[in-house]
Amino acid sequence: MINVGIVGCGFVGGALKVWLEKNNSEVIVLVSDPPKGYNDDLSKADIVFLQIHVPTEDDGTQDLTLMKELIKGLPDVPVFIRTTILPGTSEKLSKETGHKVYFMPEFLTERTHIQDFETQPMVFTGELDLLAQIFVGKTFCYMTSLEAEITKYAHNVFGAVKVTYFNAIADYCRRLGAEYKRVHAGCLLSGYINDTHTYVPGPDGKFGYGGKCFPKDVNAFAELTKDIPLGKLLAPLHELNVGFRGFEERI
């Protein structure tokens, strides 16, 4: 049996817990999240998955104080961080805590997190033999933790870019008296463009992007890359989104 520790049982940790309990009878799931009533002892864990809130400031910095404290208090086993962290953070945490720290990105949507975890492939960044025993039957791709950290930001920020682009197209249609729904349908005809993040307004009934992830990830990534071409591409996103997000208040 493999003892799998889960620190933080929000929708990310919760989806992992549900999948393991449903799909792998050779795993014992140990959960630590006192506010939610989970107080399992992680001292016998063979591996730990860590998903906690990490504050991201407007200047792109992250407060890793709590994460460091939690890692230092864990047994000497591989630790996989599933919280979005800036590129290079897992290597930094490995050096500062003395633990083997990896990053394993997640691409779950909060309202469909259980289904998403069930169907999505995974990214493995280390301890392949152990992960293969835990995630039996899961399709995965391998990369370094640094590459995975970049992947997570590239994925999330592209979603924000796509939302912003199609909001700009919808704005252009309004200005010219064209029907955005028809333009939107025409853009999807070739099959080259996936319809995700192309609806205006979005699933929340609002213009622009919102939620817990896109705003903080855009701001952090734009600040981190401000002196290179990528940052120049991302710099206008926040201001544009503020304008689109407030559009429903003006109509």
Describe each model-derived feature in a short phrase.
Residues Y38-P78:
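Rossmann-like NAD(P)-binding element
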Residues D40-D41, I114-E118, Y199-K206:
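Solvent-exposed alpha-helices and their adjacent loops that cap or buttress functional pockets
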Residues E149, T164-I251:
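Interdomain hinge/lid region at the active-site interface
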